Amino acid sequence: KKETYNMPPQSALITVMVNAARKASIRLKRDYGEVDQLQVSKKGPADFVTAADIRTEKLLREELSHARPGFGFLLEEAGEKPGEDPHRRWIIDPIDGTTNFVHGIAQFAISIAAEENGEITAGLIFEPINEEMFWAERGQGAYLNDRRIRVSSRSTMAQSLFATGIPFMGRGTEEDHDKFLAEMKAVMSVSAGIRRFGSAALDLAYVAA
C-alpha cells in the first residue's frame, strides 16, 4: 500500500545514503549493460561481477567516508573497517543479487545501513535499473522514492505471497534439500504462491511495500 502524504523531509543521514547509492549506481548500470558481452569473453562473467562488486563497494565507501569521516564500515568484500567513532558504522552490500546481475536480470540492489551502538538507525535499498529507492529511518516510517509505504493488510497465509531463497545443490546434504522442497510444498498448498526473486534485500523491501 502506497501513500503520498505525511512525508517528512529526508534527514542529513538519509540524504548522504541516497547520494552515495545514486553515484555508485552510475558505473554499476554501465557494468550491467556490458554483461551480455562477457558471456563469450575469456575473462568470463563471474570475474567481471567480482570486479563490479569491489568497484561499487569502493565507490560507496569513498562517498560515505567523505560525508561521515569518523564512521567505520562492515563491508561484504573488504570486511570490517573500524572508524574513529567506535559507536557508528556503515554496513554495505554493493550488489545484492549478483546471480541476477550476471545473467542480465534487473533484480539486484545496492544495500546500505547505518548502525549506532549496535542498532540499525537507517537503511536504504536501491534497485538502480528501475530507479526504486526504498529507505527508512527509525521513527520516521518507510518510503519508496517519495511515497510512504506500509505493509499489506493481508492477515492469512491463503491471501499472501511468500518470498524465499533456494539453497545451492552444492551446499548441504541431499536430505537438507529434500526437507526444503517438502517445506516449499507445504507452504504452496496453503498460500497464494511462492516467489524467488534472487535478491533478499529486495524481497524484504517488497514485503515492507
Q: PLM features: residue spans?
A:
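Short glycine/threonine-rich catalytic loop with a Thr-x-Gly-x-Asp
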Residues: 53, 101-104, 194-197, 201
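Short, solvent-exposed loop/turn motifs
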Residues: 120, 148-150
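Residue-level signal for inorganic ion chemistry
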Residues: 28, 53, 64, 98, ...
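An extended, acidic
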Residues: 150-209
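N-terminal subdomain of lithium-sensitive/metallo-dependent phosphomonoesterases centered on the IMPase/IPPase/PAP
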Residues: 3-95
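DPxDG-like acidic metal-binding loop motif
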Residues: 84-143
